[in-house]
């Protein structure tokens, strides 16, 4: 038994958990936490145009295999376990059986912290779908467990929508995680995504931007890279969180 919190991440596509919260995953994993990532799809359509362009005649199953390998390598770099429910993407359609699988994983791991997408994203509706399904699944799991105790409500945080669409999605972060000490780990994980080679440079710049905000809010000059989240779960405790 460990006193370290368990994290579960619900990600619409292969790259989302790495680009949006890869630093936070690495930070918790390095500190001894179990981190389990549930990808709802491989992003075989919406995230893989390069494969479709460069490999004439490639099949959907072959694209999925490439993305699965990239996903597994990246998760290994971050120190996370990962599975994919293979719901398909663009559009992402999550069925009842998939939700039951997600509930089963929540019962198995009983995370204290859950990370998923921001709830509004008109330019990438798969992300909003993933957020809706993840939040409903947590609610279902907190109501009943046919095999034991209902899930204790975890602390839920919503990560970045697609950059640079934050203004259009009304995302307003209230939580910043300093990932300076694990930023190179995040970059190495992003570099495993040969299908999306531009992401590492892109999220380096955005990590710097969020760090600038975090420095301005805290006065801490040592924050060079950060990830931003919006709290979904109300805080309940004997004292204010610090």
Predicted region positions:
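Metal-dependent de-N-acetylase/amidase catalytic core
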Residues: 1-10, 81, 88-242
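Active-site rim/loop-helix segments in enzyme catalytic domains that contact anionic ligands
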Residues: 1-109, 238-239
């Amino acid at each position: 038994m460990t006193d370290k919190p368990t994290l579960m991440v619900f990600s619409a596509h292969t790259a989302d958990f790495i680009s949006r919260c890869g630093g936070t995953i690495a930070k918790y994993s390095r500190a001894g936490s179990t981190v389990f990532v549930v990808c709802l799809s491989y992003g075989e359509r919406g995230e893989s145009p390069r494969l479709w362009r460069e490999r004439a005649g490639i099949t959907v199953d072959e694209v999925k295999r490439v993305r699965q390998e990239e996903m597994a390598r990246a998760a290994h770099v971050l120190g996370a376990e990962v599975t994919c429910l293979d719901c398909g993407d663009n559009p992402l359609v999550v069925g009842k059986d998939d939700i039951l699988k997600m509930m089963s994983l929540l019962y198995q791991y009983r995370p204290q912290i859950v990370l998923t997408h921001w709830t509004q994203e008109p330019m990438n509706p798969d992300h909003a779908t993933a957020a809706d399904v993840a939040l409903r699944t947590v609610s279902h799991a907190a109501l009943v467990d046919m095999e034991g105790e209902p899930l204790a409500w975890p602390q839920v945080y919503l990560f970045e929508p697609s950059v640079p669409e934050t203004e259009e999605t009304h995302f307003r972060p209230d939580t910043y995680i300093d990932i300076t000490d694990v930023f190179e780990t995040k970059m190495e994980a992003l570099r495993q995504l040969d299908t999306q080679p531009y992401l590492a440079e892109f999220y380096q710049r955005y990590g710097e931007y969020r760090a600038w905000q975090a420095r301005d809010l805290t006065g801490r000059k040592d924050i060079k890279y950060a990830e931003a989240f919006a709290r979904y779960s109300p805080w309940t405790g004997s004292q204010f969180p610090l």
